[in-house]
């Protein structure tokens, strides 16, 4: 795209256009209509505060409680993932019977 000629450089052929000034331009951002006002934000619902002493079982926590109850019966492995000596002996005897 050709560059605009400044009035200083147009002394040659179009000398009569030197006196004409170009209109000033406004940026598109300024000439655009102002944005509509933002609507009021809706108030958020506040959750009902519960007593700190009340316990509620949720998801995985409820499952952990079930596992602890089963552990008390002696059927589940201990907390560290180690098997009890009785269970280890039972599994070894089952393995030996298959051979």
From Swiss-Prot:
Residues recorded with modification Phosphothreonine: 10
Main localization of the protein described in the UniProt heading: nucleus
GO biological process: chromatin organization
A GO cellular-component term linked to this record: nucleoplasm
A GO MF term: chromatin binding
Induction (record text): By estrogen.
Entry-annotated residues carrying Phosphoserine: 6, 78, 93
Basic and acidic residues: bias regions: 1-25, 39-53, 62-72, 81-93
Superkingdom: Eukaryota
Keywords of the record: Chromatin regulator, DNA-binding, Nucleus, Phosphoprotein
InterPro entries associated with the record: HMGN_fam
Region (Disordered): 1-99
Disulphide linkage map: none
Cell location: Nucleus
Family affiliation: Belongs to the HMGN family.
Record's subunit section: Interacts with the ligand binding domain of the thyroid receptor (TR) (in vitro). Requires the presence of thyroid hormone for its interaction. Interacts with transcriptional regulator SEHBP. Interacts with nucleosomes.
Official protein name in the record: High mobility group nucleosome-binding domain-containing protein 3
The organism of origin for this protein: Homo sapiens (Human)
Native organism taxonomy: Eukaryota, Metazoa, Chordata, Craniata, Vertebrata
